[in-house]
Amino acid sequence: MDTTSRTRPDDRRGRPTAAAFFDVEGTLLAAPDLAAATGPLGRLWHPPVLAALHGHAALGHLVVLVARAGATELAPITRDLAPDAVLCSRPEAPMIGQGKGYAARALLRECGILAARCYAYADEAADLPLLAEVGHPVVVGDDPVLLRHARRGNWRRLPAPSAERK
């Protein structure tokens, strides 16, 4: 996906100077995986994370969805949200664990964006490599491993999706 096609308020040349990575399953969507996300997506969005996504987009940050699902499964979400980039699983490269961190780092390098200016939102210990790649990690929910890192690193925290949304 072309990450420089939109004019952005944070850089007169139209290039983003910051990025925000959003884990999809269990973070942006209240459902833990896309197979559980039946029916209209609107009721499955996790409102605080969706608000953060729109806030980053308004600032002209590169908005990136990160998911263990494949591109076909993500199609309804990408249609609704129109992210600048999507990092998702391919048959030869699942997007899990360290793969999320590697993919985020590669995208930042490709776009010339400093990691210190970037954000990542994630909900589980397996996402720690993604959170470790940015200057502003945000823990969503109450995963004990992530909460320990959040306390040590003074990371922001957002509440977990409520049970009735899952």
Would you name each region that the model predicts?
Residues 27-29:
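Hydrophobic "anchor" residues
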Residues 32-38:
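Basic, amphipathic juxtamembrane/active-site segments
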